[in-house]
Amino acid sequence: MLIEQGSQKLREFTEASYQETHKKITDGVWHISGLGHSNAVIIEGESKVILVDTLDSLERGKKLLSIIREKTGKEVGTIIYTHGHPDHRGGAGAFLESNPEIIAFAPKSAVLERTGLLRDIQNLRGYRQFGYGLTDEENISQGIGPREGEAYGEQRAFVPPSVVYGQDQVTREIEGVCLEMLRLPGETEDQIMVWVPEKKVLCCGDNYYGCFPNL
């Protein structure tokens, strides 16, 4: 299907959808969007913050840290990765000073793209999919958000998880906040959602976003 004036419509969609936003969802919970290719959720605990995803680069992670300090006056004590894609983990290095626990879930089946041949194919597909060879004027956006920091030479600062769960569901109380972490494979085999029952807040990672299909 061909779309008339497709670039203009994409530009209008991007301008309407991907402005930097720090939205208070409810008391003690903020949704941060428009800072990159992914979002982050700040959950304020008794003495520290629980952070769901870390954005895609060290530079953007540092900006997120300044927002967290501004909103809460607290440091990050726990990071939860909703899944292993780099745009959700690339900012983790910005939070090392507070020595956070970092939680992730293990994939249930083998991650095939880690094999040599498929990794090369995946990398080439990603280069085309996200328009890394395009200028800002040509790219407009990456569909589900502004361009990743990598497109501007920003450093990804991955930090391995300190706790990896193999279960399908884990419930924990962290900093006085009850968190239900549930495995729900989507873009990846390790994808989880995080439900905060007391706040009635669901952190769904890339299992749901306002752009379909993600081309």
Language-model segments: which ranges?
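Short catalytic-loop micro-motif centered on adjacent basic/acidic residues
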Residues: 31, 50-53, 77-81, 180-181
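N-terminal pre-domain segments of enzymes
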Residues: 1-19
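Active-site environment of divalent metal-dependent phosphoester hydrolases
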Residues: 59, 84-90, 109-112, 188-190, ...
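Conserved beta-strand hairpin/beta-sheet module of binuclear metal-dependent hydrolase folds
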Residues: 19-70, 193-206
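Core dinuclear metal-dependent hydrolase active-site scaffold
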Residues: 164-196, 201, 208
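Metallo-beta-lactamase
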Residues: 111-182
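Active-site metal-binding motif and surrounding structural segment of the metallo-beta-lactamase
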Residues: 17, 25, 47-48, 59-106, ...
